[in-house]
């Protein structure tokens, strides 16, 4: 039998791809997102050589010279439209966050038993399950995430810890939630006369 020389194939190396820190796309595709200007600034600060390759005067003029005048105008309009949409969405989110209230409600269960119900954390970018777990550890009580009759997720903590929860939220999440957006509410069950 003849020996066949086996050539081992060259090892395949994974290509290192840079992803934008703003829109999480490769920088070549940032122009198709709504945050092109921010992406361009990020690229300039973090990857200067790639910025020069994509956004230098020569690169831009060579790309534009290949396009017809009508296509250039349309591209400029589309870019402006996308940028305006992204800015409007950002402003809307900021406005919603500023207006959103975190409500800490003390609810009477039985005669001297209370629970604390917290709603509105998810608007500020906090995960209810994680916060509920942290609250349970912090105050050594039972805490859970439940859906209210209105369909909104809320955190229920056993015991009257509303003041402590407010202080704890401000201490841990003061950057996300301003103090003016946290309100304490006391809710008593109505006595039924029988």
Swiss-Prot record:
Q: What is known of its domains?
A: The SUI1 domain may be involved in RNA binding.
Any one Gene Ontology molecular-function term assigned to this protein's record: translation initiation factor activity
State the organism of origin: Aspergillus fumigatus (strain ATCC MYA-4609 / CBS 101355 / FGSC A1100 / Af293) (Neosartorya fumigata)
Q: What top-level branch of life does the organism fall under? A: Eukaryota
Name of the protein in its database record: Translation machinery-associated protein 22
- What family is it from? Belongs to the DENR family.
Q: Which CDD domains match?
A: DENR_C (cd11607)
The record's PROSITE patterns line, in alphabetical order, gives:
SUI1 (PS50296)
- Gene encoding the protein: tma22
